[in-house]
Amino acid sequence: MLLAHLPELGSTRLIKSRNPAEALQKLNETLTENVRRLVVIGGDGSLHLAANHVLKNGYTKQVALGLIPAGTGSDYARILRLSGDPLQALHQICTAVPRKVDVLRITDGNGEVRYAINTFSTGVSGWVSRRLAGLAVKGSAVYLRTTLKAFISFEAVDCRVVVDNTPWFEGPLYLLAITKGSHFGQGMHISPRASLDNGLCEVVAVEPMSRWRLPLRLGRLYLGNHLSASYVHYRQGRTVVIEPITNNPGFEIDGESTDAASVTVETVPAALTMLA
């Protein structure tokens, strides 16, 4: 049904892919100087892939990105207040006034650069992403089971965090999230004060917690009323440097697992044009 309505976008070419490598190959073949809009039908991972291609290949002044949520994780769609109904989301894209949004530029110790449209995090979220990356079958139920297992068995990681050239936190962490959007992890309201276009990133650190306190504190994280809690550290900034102290905890970028010894995260203002 959705395919029948795609001509509402104007002259349209549909790209289908079975994996990220094929998607990138087809984007290379398809994106030309004549393309003005790139609409992703998928989740946060698919949008992450498309946004990185646009950012790394110099299409940011030419191409506006749209999203029709259809993937396992759709936190960015929630942030943009896009409808979960594909036809409604398509209508929103067709009638939207393009808006500029910030992104996060992530540089690892080897100088490799990637971009996050929403979130870069470590701790329990990195643990979850590592395990999901190795699973052949994915979906909301698998994500929920993996997350619950993580909250029960995960051990805190030691990190040193510097924000805007000032030491901010050092010690054990359960979760460290650096975000542009308000939600991640399939609905966790981790950064309730976030803005997509203020030139700042949100930095939220959650200290380790006992198992018996976990349900209540986890509930606060999902509801978004945790920033004043004693076990949470919060601030805004433009540049964040993360240095694991004891071991490599594993990181995630927009839900995609990655490894690095140390990481620098920088806010890039007005980097992308979104249709929402």
Regions found by a protein language model. Give the residues of each.
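ATP/NTP phosphate-donor binding region
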Residues: 1-41, 48, 52-53, 57, ...
